[in-house]
Amino acid sequence: MVYFVGAGSGAADLITVRGMHMLQQADVIIYAGSLVNPELLEYARADCEIHNSARLTLEEVIKLMQEAQAQGKMLVRLHTGEPSIYGAVREQMDALDELGIPYESCPGVSACFGAAASLNLEYTLPGVSQTLIITRMEGRLFLGVDCCCVIHVVSAHIWRLSLLRGLS
């Protein structure tokens, strides 16, 4: 079984309790070394096999997943933040579907919510803002249109909105 685990927004203690338990039980961990806080690996067992995916291709990552599954090992694919937001997990899930390897996702604390917490902010306030849009920086296209154009159209119909733009 492969578990996609969100590493949270950076601090090792911002991982979910479920995510921490999965790291503690994992036989194999594949993590994005350039993005994930290495302190999270301290939750791993001493005999856990740990792989930094920063220099691995998608094919090499999938091969490690296949090998772990064939050996009956529990594998954690540790992604930064919340895997469903800019996590690039779909291509891995598609490959696992093709191979018949079961997987499950464990959410993480997204950096956007970690930022709000550290600043003691609330994105939605009654009578002020009821909409939160999470988008990439300008230059990215959504249905062939620059994201900033989409935001402009949406904001024209909303009195006030909270906006968080990713840096990637």
What are the roles of these predicted feature ranges?
Residues 1-2, 103, 112-168:
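Beta-strand/loop-alpha-helix module characteristic of Rossmann-like adenine-cofactor folds
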Residues 1-109, 114:
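Class I S-adenosyl-L-methionine
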